[in-house]
């Protein structure tokens, strides 16, 4: 078997785990398995309303945040169960297998690849722990944000291993850089991450997605309740206004980076990756606007737009971060003075 394809397979599985996690959020199913690692004390997901009531009666300290009489549908429980199945029963064992293969079966691999395999194993264990914390803390904003951040860092460890493994097999890219290259990409990476994490608070805080109103253009977008959204009284409830201002700031930074791209990115491949990430960011801005302005009194928000919004935001961060990894592993600095 061509084991060097394993990191890419794990990246795809991780993307599926993140997507299912987003689905859990839009269906309000984050607490549909109140215990961990089981679901209402069962291995399966088919838990009736009566069985849920019996479990709550036996576990009075685990009251659902929506009240003791709240019940979940089979589909809601399935989304959380499937999320755990992908992460714990498929992704986790494959990461362990990858670690064993890299450490024991491939002596020709570099020490860097072996360290990355170890890091990915440590991170998937950490991610499982954070998943447990998220359940125990009833999907608090900070725990959900930390869970997503950890998933992205884990994904980056797999991307880095994939690139390093390919380099060990002779795929040397020789990417030209200058002293400005890492600096500029780091700014874009941090900016996209901050926007993503604040967006997580918007999506997990009750009422935050309506904090700027639902009256369409221009009252609710691009304005925030008919104002510029500068007066902040409640950081969580008004996180949408903060999110929008951060998006605008990062957009200006990305426009500046695009305008000066030949100054800081001599390698065409890095410029292309930066351009792809920038256009992904801009497209996601439009998607975020569409999410707000398509609200109706009959059906509310189109929540699938929210999931795609999350995935595109994650993709933007991962593309910028992957550019940094490529430069770290394949970069050739021309030693230009800034």
PLM regions with names:
Residues 1-338:
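Polytopic transmembrane helical bundles with strong interfacial aromatic enrichment
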């Amino acid at each position: 078997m061509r084991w060097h394809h394993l990191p890419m397979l794990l990246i795809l599985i991780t993307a599926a785990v993140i997507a299912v996690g987003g689905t859990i959020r839009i269906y309000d199913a984050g607490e549909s398995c109140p215990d961990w690692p089981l679901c209402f004390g069962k291995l399966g997901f088919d838990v009736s309303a009566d069985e849920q009531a019996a479990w709550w009666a036996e576990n009075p300290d685990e009251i659902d945040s929506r009240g003791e009489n709240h019940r979940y549908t089979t589909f809601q429980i399935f989304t959380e169960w499937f999320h755990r199945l992908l992460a714990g029963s498929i992704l986790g064992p494959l990461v362990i297998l990858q670690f064993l293969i890299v450490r024991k079966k491939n002596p020709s691999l570099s020490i860097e690849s072996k360290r990355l395999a170890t890091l990915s194993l440590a991170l998937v264990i950490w991610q499982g722990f954070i998943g447990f914390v998220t359940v125990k803390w009833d999907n608090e904003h900070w725990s959900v944000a930390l869970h997503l951040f950890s998933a992205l860092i884990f994904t980056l460890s797999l991307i880095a291993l994939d690139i390093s493994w390919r380099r060990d097999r002779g795929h040397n890219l020789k990417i030209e850089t200058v002293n400005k290259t890492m600096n500029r990409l780091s700014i874009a990476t941090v900016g996209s991450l901050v926007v993503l994490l604040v967006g997580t608070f918007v999506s997990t805080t009750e009422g935050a997605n309506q904090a700027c109103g639902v009256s369409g253009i221009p009252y609710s977008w691009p304005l925030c309740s008919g104002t510029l959204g500068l007066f902040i009284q409640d950081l969580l409830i008004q996180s949408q206004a903060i999110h929008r201002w951060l998006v605008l700031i990062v957009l200006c930074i990305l426009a500046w980076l695009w305008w000066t791209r030949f100054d800081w990115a001599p390698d065409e491949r890095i410029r292309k990756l930066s351009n792809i990430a920038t256009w992904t960011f801009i497209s996601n801005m439009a998607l975020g606007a569409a999410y707000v302005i398509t609200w109706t009194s009959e059906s509310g928000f189109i929540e699938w737009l929210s999931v795609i919004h999350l995935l595109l935001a994650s993709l933007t961060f991962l593309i910028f971060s992957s550019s940094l990894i490529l430069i770290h592993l394949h970069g050739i600095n021309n030693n230009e003075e800034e």
